[in-house]
Amino acid sequence: MTVQGVKFSGVGAATPRQCLTNAHLSALVDTSDEWIQSRTGIQERHVAAPDQRLVDLASEAAGAALQMAGLDPTAVDLIILATSTPDDLFGTACLVQTRIGAVNAVAFDLTAACSGFLFALVTAAQYLRTGAYRSALVVGGDILSRWVDWGDRRTCILFGDGAGAMVLQASDVDQLLSFELRSDGRLNEHLTLAFAGTPQTLGENLAIAQGGFAPITMNGREVYRFAVTQVPEVIEKALHRAGCTVEEIDWLVLHQANQRILDAVAERLGIPQEKVISNVGQCGNTSAASIPLALSKPIQQGHIQPGDLIATAGFGAGLTWGAALFRWQ
């Protein structure tokens, strides 16, 4: 089997029309715009309407990415949807496949929380590198507003909804220079969206648990400590594998958890703020969508140029984290 390279040829994004401001949240819980901004950098976030589904946002982002890449949907071989909030627990990727007309694509969901897009991107790249497929559509999307406790000011201020997508294609030159993925289930309790079942008796000495998922719970202090120590390490590991230095990085694109984490990671790596891409102020933490959402606008506006070296890192529940180093197009 011939090993081939990977190039990144299109990106797209989608957010709901509804905008939830800090002022809105101040009417729901004991908080304020100043309190939220000083701790997170978030000013507003978008939330899906009751009739809006993940497939809607994911398909919109996918369509924009395909258009940028100049790739017909029928030419897509693989679709990976990174999400923790599917419309259907059996999977939403196939719904996206049908919606966009990618009739020839294999489609499946991947769950790695806020690390999901990065894990999906690396997974898709391996399919292309082996020659099994020629093109892949990687989508990250979440509607976390479904699973937030809107009475818990520690979490309800953080999350927004959205989707982002990227097109990967086989290439003679490999633009994915390196990656480093990590997981540690011992830290799982710090960030969960767990099943909460109620026992139901089916017969004598026979019972099951039925129920749904409890709202998101998070130990913010531990997640912050984890992110600012582990994320710089995996970025440095990816740089070492690629034979690159921190100084060669043109753009740092992290999972948009909150501005304090972005600033702390950049400072630890010695990366100046002008190289750090952030949209957390306008979008909040959009989980698996955050990296492609953050990339979309600067690419469309021409700030990110072909050949630019991008260091990206995701981190989240699991706990999972990782980094990838790639050149745009």
From Swiss-Prot:
Origin organism lineage: Bacteria, Bacillati, Cyanobacteriota, Cyanophyceae, Acaryochloridales
Gene3D superfamilies: 3.40.47.10
Residue ranges, annotated region (ACP-binding): 256-260
Cytoplasm in keyword set: yes
Signal sequence, renumbered to the chain: none
Assembly mode: Homodimer.
Reaction(s) catalysed by this chain's protein: malonyl-[ACP] + acetyl-CoA + H(+) = 3-oxobutanoyl-[ACP] + CO2 + CoA
Active site per UniProt: C114, H255, N285
Localization (cell): Cytoplasm
Keywords of the record: Acyltransferase, Cytoplasm, Fatty acid biosynthesis, Fatty acid metabolism, Lipid biosynthesis, Lipid metabolism, Multifunctional enzyme, Transferase
Acyltransferase listed as a keyword: yes
Name of the featured protein: Beta-ketoacyl-[acyl-carrier-protein] synthase III
InterPro entries referenced in this protein's UniProt entry, alphabetically: ACP_syn_III_C, ACP_syn_III_N, FabH, Thiolase-like
Domain free text: The last Arg residue of the ACP-binding site is essential for the weak association between ACP/AcpP and FabH.
Source organism (scientific name): Thermosynechococcus vestitus (strain NIES-2133 / IAM M-273 / BP-1)
